[in-house]
A protein has these predicted regions:
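Conserved tyrosine-mediated DNA breakage-rejoining catalytic core shared by Y-recombinases
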Residues: 73-107
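Basic, Lys/Arg- and aromatic-enriched nucleic-acid-binding interface segment
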Residues: 36-68
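C-terminal catalytic core of Y-nucleophile DNA break-rejoin enzymes
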Residues: 93-113, 124-153
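Short, charged phosphate-coordinating catalytic segments
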Residues: 61-82, 186
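C-terminal catalytic core of tyrosine-transesterase DNA break-rejoin enzymes
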Residues: 63, 172-192, 201
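DNA breakage-rejoining catalytic core of tyrosine-based enzymes
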Residues: 18-43, 94-105, 120-124, 214
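C-terminal secondary-structure termini that scaffold catalytic or DNA-interacting sites
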Residues: 1-37, 218-224
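Catalytic-site neighborhood detector that most strongly recognizes the C-terminal catalytic loop/helix
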Residues: 92, 192-217
Length: 224
């Protein structure tokens, strides 16, 4: 299922669609706040302006709710095409624990095509660096988290999405699971990889006004 309950369309575009002139770096509020959440419309708009590699990166970060390092260091062996399952190895996770996450069939198919077209081997990085200054073969070295962060900030800036970063995909997805889908914090932890509920709660964005209203409605039902 894509964003908004429908199909989230990935448009393969050219990197030249992004202006070549320098950008003002996008940042979190005062560099100490949380990355902005993305609406379904913003997600669609963002994906439609990305080259295939970065589009796949963005979709994987969203659907897996993974950290940027976890996704940039994925290898071909981490995608189970048959079972439509992603394995994030403990060597890449913040908690040093391996976890598995289901992926939507369409995204798995797109990843399979990407892997095949680039002739990647089992131990190759899916999102490899293609820098001409590095004497490495395709798939041998992963793209850096810094280059992904820089690219995405420029893309967000160009289309006018304020306060967003690579962290927005993870935070948006976890908030949707909790607020829109009604998942418990314990259930979300199986996807997010958080070790504690407290650390997970810091990621989630809830509507305090709506929370207060629900609590007042409880008073009425209890007749207190």
């Amino acid at each position: 299922m894509g964003v908004g309950g429908g199909e989230m369309t990935l448009h393969a575009s050219s990197a030249s669609q992004l202006p070549s002139n320098p950008y003002q770096s996008m940042c979190k509020t005062n560099r100490s706040g949380k990355a902005s959440l993305l609406s379904h419309q913003q997600m669609e708009q963002f994906l439609s302006n990305l080259p295939v590699k970065y589009g796949l990166l963005a979709e994987l970060m969203y659907f897996s709710a993974g950290r940027v390092k976890e996704i940039t260091t994925l290898k071909v062996r981490n995608i189970n095409i048959k079972d439509e399952l992603l394995t994030i190895e403990k060597s890449s996770t913040k908690t040093k624990e391996t976890r598995q996450i289901p992926l939507p069939p369409r995204l798995v198919k797109s990843l399979g095509i990407w892997i095949q077209e680039n002739q990647l081997e089992t131990d190759d990085f899916i999102f490899f660096t293609d820098s001409r200054n590095m004497n490495v073969r395709r798939g041998e070295k992963s793209i850096s988290t810094q280059s992904v962060d820089t690219f995405f900030r420029k893309a967000f800036d160009w289309i006018g999405i304020e306060g967003a970063s690579t962290h927005s995909f993870r935070r948006t997805r976890l908030t949707e699971l909790h607020v829109d889908e009604g998942w418990s914090l314990r259930e979300i932890m199986d996807i997010s990889g958080h070790k504690s509920i407290i650390s997970l709660q810091q990621y989630l964005d809830t509507d305090k006004k709506n929370t207060f209203e629900k609590y007042r409605n409880l008073f009425q039902r209890e007749e207190v």
